[in-house]
Structures are given as structure tokens and as C-alpha cells.
Amino acid sequence: GDVYKRQMVEAGRIAEAADPDIIDINFGCPVKKIAGRGAGSGMMRDVPLMVEMTRRIVEAVKKPVTVKTRLGWDEESKNIEEIALRLQDVGIAALTIHGRTRAQMYRGEADWTLIGKVKNNPAIRIPIIGNGDIDSGPKAREMFDRYGVDGVMIGRATYGRPWIFREVKHFLETGEVMPQPSVAERVEIAKEHLAKSLEIKGGRVGILEMRRHLSNYFKGLPNFKETRLKLVTLFDPNELYATLDSIADRWGDFDVSGVIPAPLSHDV
């Protein structure tokens, strides 16, 4: 436990050296190799350790520290209301809550009722950000109206659809649903996305991490199987760019307005 706490404090200091606006501790990650060794949402089984670790990081850095977590470890231990108060007590600046337990992973529907309970607890003074299943402007509006959260966070719905933020903001401001980008626009955005991924992550990781995004950019195009296979197997950036250009050439006239955005993948 102590070594882990020291490592987390050190990680906080390293993160602060990059001069970010905030330092966010992710106690929400449900992936087995993370949670199974007690990290990520595995922390929800050891609340005192979670709180103590957060306290140490808050004390070690000058930047605001925020936390992202889940409702609890499983159905029997939805302890987010207690956790929220205890984390607020040790000085976090905001809390993001994903409306599922660790045991649920990404299955079923996110339960926002507990997020609303935390937000509407008079003892809670910090901003509460809701997360889980937001995939459109209307859905974001519903969550703001129904639960009174201070913000919403969007996760899986961004895969292959980075313009969702523009869509949601537009809907919240105007009440209008934006038209979906054309195939040509998607290709341009995907190329820019790929370039940034390569620049930030390097050749190998930059391409591997783009695969789930690239295949989602073009969900719903007819006769796309072969091209999709290229997007998720090619390793040469030039071949990937050429494949993206070929999509614009071949499907440029396809009307995407009727294509429903990719459903939220549970395979994360």
C-alpha cells in the first residue's frame, strides 16, 4: 500500500510538471488487468486507501485535483455517496461519476439516479459531473435537466465521432440537432486525427490506438467490409492515408444523414 501511495504521489508530480489545468485521478477504470490488481475501480473495495491516496496527491501538487470513479464495486456495495463526501473532505476540486459499478463493466444501462443523489446532497459543494451512455445532444440535455449535474462527460460515444462535442454543444445552445458530417468531411477529420495520433503516440502505438476510431468513423457505409479490414490491419501510415482517400472517392456521394451513429460499444 505505501509503495503504491508513493508511486501515485510521484505520478501526480510528474503530471504537474507538464503544466496541465487539472490532475485527474481515474478510480473508474474497470479493465481487468487494472482493477484486478486493486487499481482503477479496484480502489472501490478499499475506500480508506482511495481517500488517503487522494489526500496525499492533493497535498503534493498545487494544481486542482479531480477524481473520476464509479457507483461502487458491485450491486451490494454502491458506496458513491459516502465516497463523494470523503473525497470532498480531502480537497478534490470536482468529481466525475460513471453510472455503473465495476462489476457491470459497460453492460446494461448507466444508472444516473445515484449521480443525482450525490449532486443534490446539500453537503456536497464541489461540481459533480455525470458520465455514462451520453451519445447525443438530447441525451445530455435530459441528464442536465433531470439530475442537475454541473457537467457531463462523454466517453465511448466519441469513438469515430469526435464531432460529438460540437453536436452536443450546438443542441444545448439552440435545441437543434446538427446534421451528421458527410463522408468527405469524415475522411478529412480522420486524417487529421491519425496525424495527431502518430505525432503524439509514435508509429506503432499511434496506429494501434487509432484502429477502433477509424473503423467507427465509417459505420453504416454499404459494402465496406474489405475497406474496414484495411483500416484495422494496415501498419503503414501512407497506406492508411491512401485508404482514407479512397473512401472519399468511392463513398463520397453516399448520404450519411440516415445513418445512425455507431452504437456505444461495450467492448472497451
PLM feature segments, named:
Residues M44-R45:
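Aromatic- and acidic-residue-enriched carbohydrate-binding clefts of CAZyme catalytic domains
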